[in-house]
C-alpha cells in the first residue's frame, strides 16, 4: 500500500479537459455515499472526427436516477467502460485482481469490468459530462450503412484473438460475444 486511494488510467491519444478527474472523483463519491458498489467510473468518449459520442446501447444498463444521487452529473451504468480515462479505487484491485495482461491490447478493460461485476458485484459507470476526445482505431468506414472503426492489421489480430479467448469465459456477456463475433469476422475479410 503506497497510500493512494485511486488509480487513474489514461490513454496517450485521449484528450481531456482540466475538470475531468474532478468530475470522476465527485461522482464516484456520490455513488459510494448512495451505497452503490463501484468498481470503476469512466468518461464519455467523443469521436474527435465527428464530434459525436461513442455510444453502445447494448453495453448500457440504465441511467442512474437523479433522485438517487443528488448533486451529481448524469451517470450511466454500463456492463463495461473504456479505460481511456477512468478511475478505479486501489482497494478494488485487491478484491477483483488486476487487468488480464495476456489480453494485451483489446478487451482488457471490458474483461476487468465484467469480472468485477460477475465475481464481486462491483458496477461500472460513465460520467456523461466528463467528456474526452478520443478516436477508436484509425478512423471509420461504412459497411452496409453502418460505421465501423478501422484498426491496423496488428490491432485486428489482437481483437480477433482476444475475442476467441474471451468467448470461453462464462462471465463475458452473450450480447458482446454475438455482436463482436460478427464484427470481427467482417473485419478479417473486408478491411485491410
Over which residues does each language-model region extend?
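Short glycine/serine/threonine-enriched helix-capping/active-site loop
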Residues: 38-44, 127, 135
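Active-site donor/metal-binding and catalytic loop motifs
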Residues: 127-147
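Acidic donor-binding/catalytic loop of UDP-sugar-dependent glycosyltransferases
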Residues: 14-27
Amino acid at each position: 500500500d503506497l497510500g493512494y486511494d485511486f488509480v487513474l488510467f489514461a490513454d496517450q491519444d485521449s484528450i481531456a479537459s482540466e475538470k475531468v478527474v474532478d468530475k470522476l472523483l465527485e461522482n464516484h463519491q456520490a455513488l459510494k455515499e448512495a451505497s452503490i458498489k463501484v468498481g470503476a467510473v469512466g468518461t464519455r468518449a467523443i469521436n474527435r472526427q465527428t464530434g459525436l459520442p461513442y455510444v453502445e446501447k447494448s453495453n448500457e444498463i440504465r441511467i442512474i436516477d437523479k433522485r438517487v444521487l443528488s448533486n451529481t452529473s448524469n451517470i450511466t451504468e454500463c456492463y463495461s467502460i473504456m479505460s481511456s480515462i477512468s478511475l478505479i479505487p486501489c482497494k478494488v484491485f485487491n478484491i477483483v485482481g488486476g487487468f488480464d495482461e495476456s489480453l494485451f491490447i483489446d478487451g482488457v478493460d471490458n474483461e476487468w469490468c465484467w469480472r468485477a461485476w460477475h465475481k464481486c458485484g462491483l458496477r461500472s459507470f460513465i460520467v456523461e459530462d466528463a467528456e474526452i476526445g478520443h478516436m477508436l482505431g484509425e478512423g471509420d468506414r461504412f459497411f452496409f450503412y453502418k460505421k465501423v472503426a478501422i484498426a491496423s492489421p496488428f490491432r485486428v489480430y489482437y481483437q480477433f484473438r482476444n475475442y476467441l479467448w474471451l468467448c470461453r469465459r462464462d462471465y463475458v456477456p452473450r450480447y458482446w460475444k454475438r455482436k463482436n463475433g460478427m464484427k470481427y469476422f467482417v473485419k478479417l475479410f473486408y478491411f485491410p
